[in-house]
Amino acid sequence: GINDLNYMYSGANLYFYQLSFDYIDNDVYVQIDDYDELDALRTTNVIENSINIYIVADLAPGGESLCGISSFVSSDVQGIVMAESCFALPDNPSTLSHEVGHYFNLLHTHTGSSDQNEDGIIDGSNAEYVDGTDCSNRGDDLCDTPADPNLGDFVNSQCEYTGDYVDGHGDSYNPDTSNLMSYSEKICRNTFSLEQEDIIIYTLLNS
């Protein structure tokens, strides 16, 4: 986990290390079923001035199993919770880095792209356009991450995008399947853009 994290964040010149390990002897937190449990866990055994990461057997606060969930800078309760099935595995080296990206205030590259009409057009009110129009105010608000229609189920084993969605201008998507903040295949994700790295550093130094 830490080795993968350090590899993924090397471009931002960040290095992480494990400060300590605590076992929470409470069966309530083995399986997280709702957001109250999630917040209660993230207020347990908190170590200040560090990223508190909690590993549980099953993480399904909204009824659907998740690999991980993280706070943002503005969140009332801080910390990252990971499902053990998604932590530090050869076929999933990226989920922890993805969640730490959220911790540093990065958005999904497909932010705003959840709405699709019956013709396969991504027409969400905040969806980023392929040509980059108003890119600093759409999607993830970054201009060096290509428009992303949400890559879940649309990336093959060669890390190629297989979808055929078009944006509100009728342009076909050419997303970055390697970006850590996407929903690409977990084995494919290993990069941040320069603007993403800038946000990571800014958040670290100013929050």
Question: Which role does the model predict for each range below?
Answer:
Residues 1-51, 55-59:
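Propeptide-to-catalytic entry region of secreted or membrane-anchored zinc metalloproteases
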Residues 1-12, 103, 107, 203-206:
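Structured segments of extracytoplasmic/periplasmic soluble domains
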Residues 192-207:
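A recurrent domain-boundary module in secreted/ectodomain proteins
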Residues 87-190:
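The catalytic-center signature of Zn2+-dependent metalloproteases
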Residues 10, 42-49, 71-76, 160-175:
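Extracellular/periplasmic catalytic domains that process cell-envelope and extracellular macromolecules
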Residues 41-114:
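Active-site-proximal segment of zinc-dependent metalloprotease catalytic domains
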Residues 25-27, 61-62, 113, 190:
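Short catalytic/ligand-binding loop motif for oxyanion handling, primarily in non-cytosolic enzymes
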